[in-house]
């Protein structure tokens, strides 16, 4: 079903839920998760998520404290 249409009508969601003995909510969430996975798998290879970068630690001062 997902290969033909990534979004379901309520009527189709009810039909699938009844056929698979699942709740409508379970079917809805499965389709939501599958859409997210599809988006993730079909990203362009050159695009990447820019994660916030952490500040680099300051370099330790050599020779500041002698033993």
Swiss-Prot record:
Keywords: Developmental protein, DNA-binding, Homeobox, Nucleus, Transcription, Transcription regulation. SMART domains: HOX (SM00389). It is found in: Nucleus. The keyword Cell inner membrane does not apply. It comes from the Eukaryota. Disulfide bonds: none annotated. One of its GO terms (cellular component) is nucleus. It holds the Pfam family Homeodomain. GO terms for molecular function: DNA-binding transcription factor activity, RNA polymerase II-specific; sequence-specific double-stranded DNA binding. Coiled coil: none annotated. Gene3D superfamilies: Homeodomain-like. Residues 1-42 bind DNA. One of its GO terms (biological process) is embryonic skeletal system morphogenesis. Belongs to the Antp homeobox family. Deformed subfamily. This is Homeobox protein Hox-A4. It comes from Rattus norvegicus.
């Amino acid at each position: 079903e997902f290969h033909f249409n990534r979004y379901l009508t309520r009527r189709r969601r009810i039909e699938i839920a009844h056929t698979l003995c699942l709740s409508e909510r379970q079917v809805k969430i499965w389709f939501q998760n599958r859409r997210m996975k599809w988006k993730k798998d079909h990203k362009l290879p050159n695009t990447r998520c820019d994660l916030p970068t952490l500040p680099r630690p300051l370099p330790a001062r050599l020779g500041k404290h002698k033993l």
